[in-house]
């Protein structure tokens, strides 16, 4: 699928982005290059390769789970403008 300046304008509209018409051709060229690289990756033979999350089979050392900061919930709730049942009350923003 080739991307032209019309497709760039449609996608920019859907994404609520402003794209200058003079930049549209350069942007479509770059997007076509990206799609060509993706197509090249899709042509790679991966038969017999197990799915993996990371190319290296190593595990990260984990630090001990130690409390490093005090719980200041009560102090924060004490200065909140409105609290109910231990929770902050905020104005409704969605009807």
UniProtKB/Swiss-Prot annotation:
Subunit structure: Heterotrimer of A, B and C subunits.
Swiss-Prot/TrEMBL GO biological process terms: glutaminyl-tRNAGln biosynthesis via transamidation; regulation of translational fidelity; translation
Recorded name of the encoding gene: gatC
Known function: Allows the formation of correctly charged Asn-tRNA(Asn) or Gln-tRNA(Gln) through the transamidation of misacylated Asp-tRNA(Asn) or Glu-tRNA(Gln) in organisms which lack either or both of asparaginyl-tRNA or glutaminyl-tRNA synthetases. The reaction takes place in the presence of glutamine and ATP through an activated phospho-Asp-tRNA(Asn) or phospho-Glu-tRNA(Gln).
Coiled-coil region(s): none
Catalytic activity: L-glutamyl-tRNA(Gln) + L-glutamine + ATP + H2O = L-glutaminyl-tRNA(Gln) + L-glutamate + ADP + phosphate + H(+); L-aspartyl-tRNA(Asn) + L-glutamine + ATP + H2O = L-asparaginyl-tRNA(Asn) + L-glutamate + ADP + phosphate + 2 H(+)
HAMAP family for the chain: GatC (MF_00122)
MF-aspect GO terms: asparaginyl-tRNA synthase (glutamine-hydrolyzing) activity; ATP binding; glutaminyl-tRNA synthase (glutamine-hydrolyzing) activity
EC number: 6.3.5.-
Domain of life: Bacteria
InterPro entries from the UniProt entry: Asp/Glu-ADT_sf_sub_c, GatC
Keywords per UniProt: ATP-binding, Ligase, Nucleotide-binding, Protein biosynthesis
Name of the protein: Aspartyl/glutamyl-tRNA(Asn/Gln) amidotransferase subunit C
Keyword NADP: no
Pfam families: GatC (PF02686)
Family of the protein in this entry: Belongs to the GatC family.
